């Protein structure tokens, strides 16, 4: 039962093959048995089972919706009433929110049962989930490897079938890269599609929540519940609600032959995504996936995203600048850890932040404060914003000749734990294919498409699919067609 997808579990609940309480108990038992992965930072069985009992009561009355009784885990960046909400930081080690994030509230309103809070890089700053105050997360496929970050706890939980689905957030690739490393499906929606209210902020012009699950169809179900306008989030976009499942299983164009359902689909391949730095084993898996798309009737079209390399310096100016502002609220007075011994008020600020923040967070706060300082604001921050606009324009130019863009989610498979901890630049380079999508505010997703080679043969590869603004339903259709033709998304780690 634990290996079933959300769609399959929904059918099992409807057929009364199991109850919501039995499902919750099953996953809680698995979470407890897999503590060594360190995927979860807070579990409360009593709270979970109370929600499951309420879901069973709804189902018994013939009420409830598509997600009622289905379990989900939440990344610990979403504040969740009753559970600790720490953002992976000592600064918030024992913080409990008096309210739920909109994402959490909407999924609970849809009847989903919260299994617990997943581990993450501190304040979502990292690509390996080694920056957490609660310890590193291990990749279920190879426990010597990282699971990706910053949503590494969520990706590991779904991969190990400790939860059928989880929420994540993506600022520069933090859903897509860990989904790639852990062999699960994850989608970052268009910026503003999912409410940021109650999501502990890193970089406000980039942060976006999204689902992680076994398949594109599961992600579509979750996105139906998660998305929508929220007046409490000033970046939330007013658009009519839509059904993200509506194109699943449908041909790209009416009248397409059953054997060529994607005839007419134009897939853009950026030259910049297939050059130096892309590992051979990742390239081989991506090429095989593209051939599968051709077999389904799609056409491959060369495109160019000439500012791809600039996305790294642009991101690491803008994101730290916004982080330095957002994290100024954690001062030991209003929120978070307070030093036990200090002299005056200023000394308390300094010691509380020095003790509460980890090295990577401190590094980014310092960088952000520097680029916003007098004399550097114009030279760095404003210049980065100008290039960001050009990056977005490059995508629009590419979409004139294609419907979706594809390439690797990451230049390599997951690396060993500790391999890049002393070299932040190498860590930053791991997000080269995802950063530009975030800077442009576009939707993107990663779907499993193979494995590495040699010593990396157990480490998954993810195919990145990028859509134009608000084109998630079509993007999910394209991913779903691939998953109907292949079984990479059904593969599980040994012992699972």
Curated annotation (Swiss-Prot):
Superkingdom in the source lineage: Bacteria
Keywords: ATP-binding, Ligase, Nucleotide-binding, Protein biosynthesis
Catalytic reactions on record: L-glutamyl-tRNA(Gln) + L-glutamine + ATP + H2O = L-glutaminyl-tRNA(Gln) + L-glutamate + ADP + phosphate + H(+)
InterPro entries referenced in this protein's UniProt entry, alphabetically: Amidase, Amidase_CS, Amidase_dom, AS_sf, GatA
Gene3D superfamilies per the UniProt record, alphabetical: Amidase signature (AS) domain (3.90.1300.10)
Entry's EC annotation: 6.3.5.7
GO biological process terms, semicolon-separated: translation
MF-aspect GO terms: ATP binding; glutaminyl-tRNA synthase (glutamine-hydrolyzing) activity
First-level EC class: ligase
Matches recorded under Pfam families: Amidase
Annotated active site: 75 (charge relay system), 150 (charge relay system), 174 (acyl-ester intermediate)
GO cellular component, as recorded: glutamyl-tRNA(Gln) amidotransferase complex
Family under the similarity heading: Belongs to the amidase family. GatA subfamily.
Purpose: Allows the formation of correctly charged Gln-tRNA(Gln) through the transamidation of misacylated Glu-tRNA(Gln) in organisms which lack glutaminyl-tRNA synthetase. The reaction takes place in the presence of glutamine and ATP through an activated gamma-phospho-Glu-tRNA(Gln).
Subunit: Heterotrimer of A, B and C subunits.
Protein name listed in UniProt: Glutamyl-tRNA(Gln) amidotransferase subunit A
Gene: gatA
């Amino acid at each position: 039962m634990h290996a079933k997808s959300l769609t399959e579990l929904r059918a099992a609940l409807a057929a009364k093959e199991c109850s919501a309480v039995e499902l919750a108990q099953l996953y809680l038992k698995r979470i407890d048995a897999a503590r060594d992965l360190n995927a979860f930072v807070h579990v409360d069985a009593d709270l979970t089972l109370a929600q499951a009992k309420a879901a069973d009561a709804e189902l018994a009355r013939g009420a409830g919706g598509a997600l009622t009784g289905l379990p989900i885990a939440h990344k610990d960046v979403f504040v969740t009433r009753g559970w600790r909400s720490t953002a992976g930081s000592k600064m918030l080690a024992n913080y409990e929110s008096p309210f739920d994030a909109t994402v959490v509230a909407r999924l609970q309103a849809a009847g989903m049962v919260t299994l617990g809070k997943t581990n993450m890089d501190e304040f979502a700053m990292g690509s390996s989930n080694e920056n957490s105050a609660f310890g590193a997360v291990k990749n279920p496929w190879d426990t010597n490897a990282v699971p990706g970050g910053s949503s590494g706890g969520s990706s590991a939980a779904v991969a190990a079938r400790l939860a059928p689905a989880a929420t994540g957030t993506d600022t520069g690739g933090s859903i897509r890269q860990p989904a790639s490393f852990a062999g699960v499906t994850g989608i970052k929606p268009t910026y503003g599609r999912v409410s940021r209210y109650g999501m502990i902020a890193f970089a406000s012009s980039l942060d976006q929540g999204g689902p992680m699950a076994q398949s594109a169809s599961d992600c579509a179900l979750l996105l139906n519940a998660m998305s929508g306008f929220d007046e409490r989030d000033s970046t939330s976009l007013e658009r009519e609600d839509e059904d993200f499942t509506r194109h699943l299983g449908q041909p790209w164009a009416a009248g397409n032959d059953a054997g060529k359902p994607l005839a007419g689909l134009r897939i853009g391949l950026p030259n910049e995504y297939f050059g130096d730095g892309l590992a051979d084993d990742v390239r081989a898996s991506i090429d095989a996936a593209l051939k599968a798309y051709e077999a389904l009737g799609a056409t491959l079209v060369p495109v160019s995203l000439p500012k791809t390399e600039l996305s790294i310096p642009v991101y690491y100016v803008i994101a730290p600048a916004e982080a330095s502002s957002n994290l100024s609220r954690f001062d030991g007075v209003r929120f978070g850890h307070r030093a036990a011994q200090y002299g005056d008020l200023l000394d308390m600020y300094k010691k509380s932040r020095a003790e509460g923040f980890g090295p990577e967070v401190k590094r980014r706060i310092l960088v952000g404060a520097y680029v916003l300082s007098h004399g550097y604001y114009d030279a760095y921050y404003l210049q980065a914003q100008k290039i960001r606009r050009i990056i977005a324009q490059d995508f629009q130019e590419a979409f004139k000749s294609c419907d979706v863009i594809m390439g690797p989610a990451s230049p390599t498979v997951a690396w060993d734990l500790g391999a890049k901890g002393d070299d932040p630049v190498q860590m930053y380079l791991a997000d080269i294919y995802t950063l530009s999508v975030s800077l442009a505010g576009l939707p993107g997703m990663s779907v499993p498409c193979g494995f590495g080679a040699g010593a990396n043969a157990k480490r998954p590869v993810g195919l990145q699919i990028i859509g134009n603004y608000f084109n998630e339903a079509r993007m999910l259709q394209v991913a779903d067609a691939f998953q109907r033709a292949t079984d990479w998304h059904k593969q599980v780690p040994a012992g699972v």
